[in-house]
Swiss-Prot record:
InterPro entries: MPN (IPR037518), RadC_JAB (IPR025657), RuvA_2-like (IPR010994), UPF0758 (IPR001405), UPF0758_CS (IPR020891), UPF0758_N (IPR046778), UPF0758_YicR (IPR022820). Keywords: Hydrolase, Metal-binding, Metalloprotease, Protease, Zinc. Disulfide bonds: none annotated. Zn(2+) binds at H170, H172, D183. This is UPF0758 protein ECA0145. Residues 99-221 form the MPN domain. Belongs to the UPF0758 family. YicR subfamily. A motif (JAMM motif) lies at residues 170-183.
Amino acid sequence: MGWEKGLAPREKLVRLGAESLTDAELLAIFLRTGLPGVHVMQLAENLLAQFGSLYQLMTAEQSAFHNARGVGISKYTQIKAIAELSRRLFFSRLAKEDAMLNPEATGQYLQLLLSRREREVFLVLFLDNQHHVIRHQEMFVGTINSVEVHPREIVREALKANAAALILAHNHPSGKAEPSQADRAITEQIVKACLLLEIRVLDHLVIGHGEFVSFAERGWI
């Protein structure tokens, strides 16, 4: 659907607030300019249609933009800067709040990090005794459908970070977040290894495309 001229996105934001803007209008503000014969709003709508959603646009790799008309290096860096600002906003929140009190925010943060990765990545959030995030680390990178995980290395990094608790996470590049039996088995091994040093594993989140599954919510931890 083509763009019809109306209230400009910047003017709409000032008058009605940022929450009143569509995804395309917000994106247009960051893109700033369109192409010869293509208004910036139309460019924003075209990009969202091509990638399928704002989330997929923001998390796409640079190679995915090669066939995106109107997205040179300047606009690509603008888009990735927005995505990185969003990631840092989520992290600043998790660093100040109990990560277990808002599992949805934790899941969204991990989706930003993992959901569009082409290989399985096993990541750990290291938490202090108030469940504030100290840092995160990608511990292991595997293939398109598996990743080899070593519990002792996770324990070693937890001790280095002086972590009192952990949240585990890994992605399924297939897009389906349903945990496998292997996922459950390795989680049990990590929980047992950590308990020996009184480090708690609070959750394990499996990240898909636009969805995630929490072991804690299912009562598996």
